[in-house]
Amino acid sequence: MSQNKLVSITIVTYNSGRFIKRCLESVLAQRYPSREIIVIDNNSQDGTVDILEQFEDRCTVVYNDENIGFAAAQNQAIGLSSGDWVLTLNPDVLLLPNFIQALVDAGQIHPKIGTVCGKLLAMTATFDIPARPLVDSTGIYFNPMLRHLDRGSQEIDNGHYLNFEYVFGATAAAALYRRQMIEDIAIVNEFFDPDFFVYREDADVAWRAQLMGWRCIYTPHARGYHVRNVLPGNRRALPPEINMHSVKNRFLMRIKNMTPDLYRRNWFSITVRDVVVLGACLLHEHSSLRAFVYLAKNWKRVIAKRREIMRRRRAKDDYIASWFSYRPVSRPAPKPTARTLAKARAARG
């Protein structure tokens, strides 16, 4: 339906040898013809490089000498890209053939749609699809404790989430971002915040985008599968480094994006969660105490980013506060039609 605007698919690999071949094959099988693929490898040591070399004639592949983190590597890929849209993709994602087309169609509905997400279903680490499909994500939402969660996560997929909806944000495992939004909300020319390194960087982008007046739409027509490694219930099984970044990024996200009004409305819930997090670090997860050392050392830079975000903020307090709920919040969105897509094409000349 949509005129074929160039879509840049950006993938970051780090010891992703189990997944990357099938991920790239699913991207190359997309029916959407106007695309470029950029892969940044963060110094993988597991054979990922050997696999990527097989795709160098169909992708741009950059091999970093060190692991600079997901956020910085995605920024690196975005800097090399030239598409009107950027699809960030995890290597453990498998896309159905119309995924990109459906995302682009949904993005044409309104010029202030800066992010588009589809319906991701859960998949095993061997890329097996369960007999009873489970939802992985249909967008992300925040609760009053400032926890960000995937909408529908681990629910049995019985045919729900069938409507186009505005949601708070998208998981960067498979999120389509409008170039105009990327440039508009970037801080110090960085879309993802490299201070995050890994984890929660997509929630930070979602919050910043909402503050700056952009919207995220969910389309049920874009379907894919994702191997989910980080879930609320499996924290103890994760590497200490990931858990440390999780703690650090919870506070980074808040320092940068939380308005005084939002804190006033939710201070009790936020404090309860902070006590739980700090108590867990002191009693059980000592390695995560490094998160607070990082915040102290980099305080001036983080505060400078906050000042810039608040200076450029466009959204009103009531609107932002309306998204923070213990139940996922969504709002009805129109479907893409031939007429809306034709208008979008005409506007582009």
Region roles according to the model:
Residues 140, 144-149, 155-179, 198, ...:
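A recurrent flexible, glycine/aromatic-enriched loop bordering the glycosyltransferase active site
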Residues 1-29:
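N-proximal low-complexity "stem/linker" segments adjacent to membrane-targeting elements
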Residues 86:
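Short aromatic/hydrophobic "clamp" motif used to bind/position activated sugar donors
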